[in-house]
Amino acid sequence: MAALMLQGTGSDVGKSVLVAGLCRALANRGLRVRPFKPQNMSNNAAVTIDGGEIGRAQALQALACRTPPHSDMNPVLLKPQADRTSQLIVHGRVRGTLGSGNFRAGRGALLPDVLESYGRLRRQCDIVIVEGAGSPAEINLRAGDIANMGFARAARVPVVLVGDIDRGGVIAAIVGTRTVIDAEDAAMIKGFVINKFRGDPALFDDGYRAIAERSGWPGLGVVPWLAAAARLPSEDAVILERRADAREGRRIVACPILPRIANFDDLDPLKQEPGVELLMVPPGQPIPAEAAIIVLPGSKATIADLAALRREGWDIDIKAHHRRGGLILGLCGGYQMLGTRIADPLGIEGAASEVEGLGLLDVTTELAPAKTLREVTGTAWNSPVAGYEMHMGATVGTDTARPFARIDGGGGEGAINAAGNVIGTYIHGLLASPALRSALLAKIGVAGNGRDHGADVDAALDDIAAELAIHIDIGALLRIAAHPV
């Protein structure tokens, strides 16, 4: 069994996309491939085939491998709830809540969990493609590390270092990494890849050679800016692009960017609809009055994010939109916010508390320790819907008598107000269902294009894989992967 780990000179250098692309390129060669990320920090999570949860980036990488996502692919997941507090997920299950200092001090104890998952994956496939987190150059975090060199050395997995040339300073980033890490860690690195290059790569030939000479590592490729990456689900950052008016007569779908926004890739299918403009509203900006739909997204800290929403004055914008008869869709945490009350008697999100909701749905929510994790199928608005639930607590009330969806093998799910313009649901991913998305857009006079979002993502993975096959020496990567360090 072979294995290869991609580590970066920093965060956001494109490791996740490169891992996904390599997974698809190798799967296209007929290899059995599995993705692996020892430790991830993200509030964007996916439900796994074994009933757990992992980072959505690893779920995308599993799709690239043409295999179902499994909790072993991301054994340690941190989901930030506050600036210094995160929910700890191990093997897909909640293990508790940790402060940042506690995690740094105790993360080394999670290495056996990480190696256990990695060992199971190894036995299932021909090659594992591993993604690091942050950078091995963060030597202040080296003690107890399980995300980068701590894992690589324990599992004897060779490393390729990825540098992002688009942000500038890639020569210093790679050579600087070689300078600050110790000799044993440096020996794990078997080459480097330049990512996100724009223009003629021949212009970087001198720089490419200089990196190889100064680092002692061979170059394994220069990857161009991958336009197809924009067609993949969002992972850790929302593009804060705001326009005052809809372009070319498009109707605006507005979504406020909450501090602990979660699973915001729920909205990605709207980006491919020519009749709408998806507007992510950043703090400090009002939700525009011309919005046709307001979406309240998921949240990892519903009560705190509701307070933040009120501080921004977005509650005023939302209620004004409601009075005008505008459509409002609440997803998961956003659904909870639309109710009359949210109670957290056990302090799931922090101190025990009870707060007033926006009062646009006659429902109440009580948070509880048990987490609902399941994939669902059903019907809504006479259209098939498929997605997943991932929440803690239950929502009850009069408006649940008008459910948003009927779940196969179950009852009603979600709630709709009497006027029919306020909708709440726990189903993530529902907008990827073409008929359901078209039914929603029909309510604002827009014809949906009926495109299959999943097929578009799959095609993007193939496009990225084809680019990597041209610009990276995949044969060299396979030779490196075949020899444990």
UniProtKB/Swiss-Prot annotation:
NCBIfam families in alphabetical order: cobQ, PRK00784.1
SUPFAM superfamilies: Class I glutamine amidotransferase-like (SSF52317), P-loop containing nucleoside triphosphate hydrolases (SSF52540)
Native source species: Sphingopyxis alaskensis (strain DSM 13593 / LMG 18877 / RB2256)
Cysteine disulfide links: none
Entry function: Catalyzes amidations at positions B, D, E, and G on adenosylcobyrinic A,C-diamide. NH(2) groups are provided by glutamine, and one molecule of ATP is hydrogenolyzed for each amidation.
Protein name: Cobyric acid synthase
Pfam families from the UniProt entry: CbiA (PF01656), GATase_3 (PF07685)
GATase cobBQ-type domain mapped to chain residues: 250-436
GO BP annotation list: cobalamin biosynthetic process
Pathway membership, UniProt: Cofactor biosynthesis; adenosylcobalamin biosynthesis
An MF annotation (GO) of this entry: ABC-type vitamin B12 transporter activity
Location of the active site: C332 (nucleophile), H428
Phylogenetic classification of the source organism: Bacteria, Pseudomonadati, Pseudomonadota, Alphaproteobacteria, Sphingomonadales
Record PANTHER family: COBYRIC ACID SYNTHASE, DETHIOBIOTIN SYNTHETASE
Keywords in alphabetical order: Cobalamin biosynthesis, Glutamine amidotransferase
InterPro entries listed in its UniProt record: Class_I_gatase-like (IPR029062), CobQ/CobB/MinD/ParA_Nub-bd_dom (IPR002586), CobQ_GATase1 (IPR033949), CobQ_N (IPR047045), CobQ_synth (IPR004459), GATase_3 (IPR011698), P-loop_NTPase (IPR027417)
Gene name as annotated: cobQ
Highest taxon in the source lineage: Bacteria
Family: Belongs to the CobB/CobQ family. CobQ subfamily.
